[in-house]
């Protein structure tokens, strides 16, 4: 066997599995795995066995009954972990089973188009922002946006104009953005610049603490000036499934909405969705960046997890 690195190392294993180098070997494989590589798994096993209530993501909360009832047939992921082979479509050029999954998600959320994200909402935010802007464009964004929004601003060399959401001193969190705050910042910018320079407004709603912005009124106002609204709704993937929740940004008229299905729905970590409403945005340009920011080896296990979690909430 050959390993190529700073130095070339050769190990000649005989039929018994013995090596001409020092160290222990396994008669079956010839090499004994380094136990240090299992430290992460061992720590996860210990955490699972301690029966700690998980007040954190993902949304399944390690609920044994939920997992057995709805996820049991997913089985051993290693047995189903594949790449783009015949009959299994291709996420980057979806035409059959994956295209059907996208269409089902769009129908469920009421979007014109929905696509899976296996690189988290991060990939969705970056695809959306880069897909509606060009170098040196102006965007209005809430100062409490996710770091992925800032990364997109940096990568596309954009000029951000910040909205500073009101801070609640009593509870220690930022409130949602109001229509008045949007109008004020647009008017302020337009007093010295061309309003047409504003290529997008980017908001986080709900916030991590659950505060929502007035998305419906904001979207209606911005659309008067042909300004697209991007909503990072990572923590609101569940909004669409009960009248007890705030209305989803998709149904409120936002142009692009990103949901982390792993945050509040029973899907695996780093799974998410991007939804698009037709009218203002260039769908194909967004798709181009969606392809750029997604892995070229998308996990079928993660995609299956998204499909299963949506099936659960639908039924």
Language-model-derived ranges and their functions:
Residues 37-43, 51, 69-71, 93, ...:
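Conserved PLP-enzyme active-site core in the AAT-like
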Residues 77-121:
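Conserved N-terminal alpha-helix of the aminotransferase class I/II PLP-enzyme fold
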């Amino acid at each position: 066997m050959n390993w190529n690195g700073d130095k070339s190392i050769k190990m000649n294993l005989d039929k018994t599995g013995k090596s001409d180098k020092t160290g222990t070997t396994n008669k079956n494989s010839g090499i004994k795995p380094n136990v240090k590589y299992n430290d992460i798994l061992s720590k996860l096993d210990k955490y699972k066995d301690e029966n700690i209530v998980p007040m954190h993501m993902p949304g399944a909360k390690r609920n044994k009954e939920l997992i057995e009832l709805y996820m049991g047939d997913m089985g051993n992921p290693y047995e189903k972990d594949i790449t783009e082979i015949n009959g299994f479509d291709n996420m980057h050029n979806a035409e059959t089973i994956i295209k059907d999954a996208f269409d089902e998600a769009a129908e469920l959320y009421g979007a014109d188009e929905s696509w899976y994200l296996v690189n988290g909402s991060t990939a969705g935010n970056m695809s959306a922002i880069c897909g509606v802007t060009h170098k040196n464009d102006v965007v209005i964004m809430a100062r409490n946006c996710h770091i992925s929004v800032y990364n997109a601003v940096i990568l596309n060399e954009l000029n951000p104009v910040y909205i500073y959401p009101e801070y609640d001193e009593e509870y220690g969190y930022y409130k949602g953005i109001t229509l008045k705050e949007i109008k004020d910042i647009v008017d302020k910018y337009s007093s010295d610049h061309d309003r047409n320079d504003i290529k997008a407004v980017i908001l986080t709603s709900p916030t991590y603490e659950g505060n929502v912005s007035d998305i419906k009124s904001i979207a209606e106002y911005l659309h008067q000036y042909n300004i697209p609204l991007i909503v990072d709704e990572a923590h609101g993937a569940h909004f669409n499934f009960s009248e007890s929740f705030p209305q989803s940004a998709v149904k409120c008229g936002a142009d692009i909405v990103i949901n982390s299905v792993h945050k509040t729905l029973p899907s695996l970590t780093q799974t998410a969705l991007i939804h698009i409403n037709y009218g203002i945005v260039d769908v194909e340009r967004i798709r181009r960046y969606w392809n750029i920011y997604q892995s070229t080896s998308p996990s079928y296990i993660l995609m299956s997890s998204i499909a299963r979690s949506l099936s659960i909430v639908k039924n």
